Amino acid sequence: MQKIGVFVCWCGSNIAGTVDVAQVVEAVRQIPDVAYAIDYKYMCSEQGQELIRKAVADYKLDRLVVCSCSPRMHEATFRKCAEGVGINPYMVEIANIREQCSWVLKDKAEATAKAIKLAKAAIAKVRFNGALKPGESQVVKRALVIGGGIAGIQTALDIAEAGYKVDIVEKEPTIGGRMAQLDKTFPTLDCSACILTPKMVDAANHENITLYTYSEVESVSGFVGNFDVTIRKKARSVKADMCSGCGICTEKCPSRKTPSEFDMGLKNRGAIYISFAQAIPKVPVIDREACIKFKTGKCGICSKVCPAGAIDYTQTDELITEKYGAIVLATGFETMPLDKFGEYGYGASKDVITSLELERLTNAAGPTEGHLVCPSTGKEPKKVIIVSCVGSRDVSGRGKSYCSKICCMYNAKHAMYI
């Protein structure tokens, strides 16, 4: 039979001011396997820990539940106390009745009822705990960064400069992410490309960094320090090791009806394309859904004009498995789907655009070479209205209830250079 000891802390008035600790003690005493239960003002104090040690000796306790503050505060304290009296430290469970109970509830009856439930849950958990021993395992000294935007690039550079190998996996054909689409940064209105492109080059040329562009993480298994990751390297239909990035294939492609993802659909691109002039790697990719060759078996112009013979229509996806000690998620953001917000006219009027579409219109390398025009007419607008917080702080359920924290800043930026 297990012998569980339950120790309920007052935490001064932090807990006892809202929770009836005596009632909690009385409730847990009725639970099978609870051999001892008591409350005390400060269970983490030396006097409180001595109370625990004495109870273990007197009642031959083999498992402990401490109802107190967050385990982030004192889990190590109580584990060390248990270990000192011969109880495996992993036979200790913390019921957080402060941050998760007394600090978030005002009604004493409600807080006490919740504290009892939390205590019961911890008791149920500790019944199934097993004695564990700390072990050691070799950590793979290689990191994976998922996302090749500015955050992912800078993270990879920092890790690489510290002397570790690091791989970047980016789903788009090039690194750069959203920052590559921007014209200027806030609040200094510095050139976005002037900041980003040197870092892109540094990442591509760093001896400790490997780029997996046009690739996605297929699966992750393992544990901290030892992850097994499968990466799907999608077929570009272009041999990267042979391509010089001359761009002849993209110029000659006759299929030019696909909206450019990089330019937010404000102009079209070819079926074979390079996202933007500073792309890294500067290797085109064939969009098989738009390519005449893949749809009909005809055309093949890009293969005919390629001076390096780099076009490969038979190329297939490649699965690569690597081991990593750490994984960083730097996956970036997407704009809020505006089909949920019909009152603004997005989709109904070509002249209602998103912030990223505005970025492309005002970018010197964008579809209008930096000239702000109305998409419907191609003429310069007389007035511009900026609607803030669309989809943010939304209580209707269509967007997010919280503030995006960035839209006010980029709205101010747009207003400044418009």
Where are these regions (language model features)?
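Rossmann-like dinucleotide/flavin-binding elements
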Residues: 47, 57-59, 102-176, 234-321, ...
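A short, flexible N-terminal coil/short beta segment enriched in small residues
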Residues: 1-17
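A conserved short coil-to-beta-strand element within the FAD-binding core of flavoproteins
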Residues: 43-45, 213-225, 288-290, 317-318
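N-terminal glycine-rich dinucleotide-binding loop that anchors FAD/FMN and/or NAD(P) in oxidoreductases
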Residues: 21-35, 43, 51-54, 80-97, ...
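Periplasmic-binding protein-like
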Residues: 61-69
